[in-house]
C-alpha cells in the first residue's frame, strides 16, 4: 500500500512538472494579436528573396530583357544603336540643288536603310536573274558600295543599301545595264536600258493594228464604190 501511494505521488509530480514546463514555453496571452494574424508577414520583416533563374533555362523573352538591361547600363556607341534609335543626320541645305529634287532625298536618306526593286528584261528564269543580278552586285562591290541582294521573283530582285544616300548613284548604274528593264526607287519607276525592247514590240504591234484597220477601211470603201456603180448601170 505504501509503495502504491509513493507511485501515485511520483506520477502526479511528473504531470505537474510537465504542465509547468508547457506553460513556460507558451507565449503570453495577447502577443499573437499584437504581432498580427498567423500567415500575415510582418511589415518589418523583409520579403523573401526571389530565386534567380538559371541562365540555362532562359527563353527568348528573358534574353531580350537581359539585353535591354545591358543597353540601359552600358554606353553604346551611336553606330551600334538600332536604326530607329539613331539621331537623324543634320541636313546641310547649302549643298542642296533646288533644280534637282533627288539631292534633297539623298540628304534625308543618309545613314538610313533603303531598298530598291530591279526588274531583269528578256523574261528570264529565276536562275538567270540570280546570275545577272549577282554580276551587278559584284560590280557595285568593286566600286565600294555596300549592297545586299534578294531574289523575289523570276525576273525581280531587291537591292538593299545600308546608306540610302547612295541609292540614286546605284540606280544610275543599274538603269545603264543591258538587261535592266526598270528600277523602282521611292515609288518612282526609272526605265532601264533593257526595257526598250518592250516599247519596240509595242510600237510594232500598234503599227500592225493600224495597218489592218487601214486595209479594212479600203476594202469597205471599194465594195461601196462597186455597189454604187452597179446601181448606176441598172
From Swiss-Prot:
Location of the motif Prevents secretion from ER: 231-234
Region feature (Disordered): 31-95, 187-234
Cellular compartments annotated: Endoplasmic reticulum
Keywords carried by this UniProt record: Chaperone, Disease variant, Endoplasmic reticulum, Glycoprotein, Osteogenesis imperfecta, Signal, Wnt signaling pathway
Spans annotated as Escort domain: 165-204
Signal sequence, renumbered to the chain: 1-33
A Pfam family this chain is assigned to: Mesd
Residues the record marks as carrying a glycan: 201
GO biological process, one term: phagocytosis
Entry remark concerning the domains of this protein: The chaperone domain provides a folding template for proper folding of the beta-propeller (BP) domains of LRP5/6.
Family the UniProt entry places it in: Belongs to the MESD family.
Subunit structure: Monomer. Interacts with LRP5; the interaction prevents LRP5 from forming aggregates and chaperones LRP6 to the plasma membrane. Interacts with LRP6; the interaction prevents LRP6 from forming aggregates and chaperones LRP6 to the plasma membrane. Interacts with LRP4; the interaction promotes glycosylation of LRP4 and its cell-surface expression.
Protein name: LRP chaperone MESD
Amino acid at each position: 500500500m505504501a509503495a502504491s501511494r509513493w507511485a501515485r505521488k511520483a506520477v502526479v509530480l511528473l504531470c505537474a512538472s510537465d504542465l509547468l514546463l508547457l506553460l513556460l514555453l507558451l507565449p503570453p496571452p495577447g502577443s499573437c494579436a499584437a504581432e498580427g494574424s498567423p500567415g500575415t508577414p510582418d511589415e518589418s520583416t523583409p520579403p523573401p528573396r526571389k530565386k534567380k533563374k538559371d541562365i540555362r533555362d532562359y527563353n527568348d523573352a528573358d534574353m531580350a530583357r537581359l539585353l535591354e538591361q545591358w543597353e540601359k547600363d552600358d554606353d553604346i556607341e551611336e553606330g551600334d544603336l538600332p536604326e530607329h534609335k539613331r539621331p537623324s543626320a543634320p541636313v546641310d541645305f547649302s549643298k542642296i540643288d533646288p533644280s534637282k529634287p533627288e539631292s534633297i532625298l539623298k540628304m534625308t536618306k543618309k545613314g538610313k536603310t533603303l531598298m530598291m526593286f530591279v526588274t531583269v528584261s528578256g523574261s528570264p528564269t529565276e536562275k538567270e536573274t540570280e546570275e545577272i543580278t549577282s554580276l551587278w552586285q559584284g560590280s557595285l562591290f568593286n566600286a565600294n558600295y555596300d549592297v545586299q541582294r534578294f531574289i523575289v521573283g523570276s525576273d525581280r530582285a531587291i537591292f538593299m543599301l545600308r546608306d540610302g544616300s547612295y541609292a540614286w548613284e546605284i540606280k544610275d548604274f543599274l538603269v545603264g545595264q543591258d538587261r535592266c528593264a526598270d528600277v523602282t526607287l521611292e515609288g518612282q519607276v526609272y526605265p532601264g536600258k533593257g526595257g526598250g525592247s518592250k516599247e519596240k514590240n509595242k510600237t510594232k504591234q500598234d503599227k500592225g493594228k493600224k495597218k489592218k484597220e487601214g486595209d479594212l477601211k479600203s476594202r469597205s470603201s471599194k465594195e461601196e464604190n462597186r455597189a454604187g456603180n452597179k446601181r448606176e448601170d441598172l
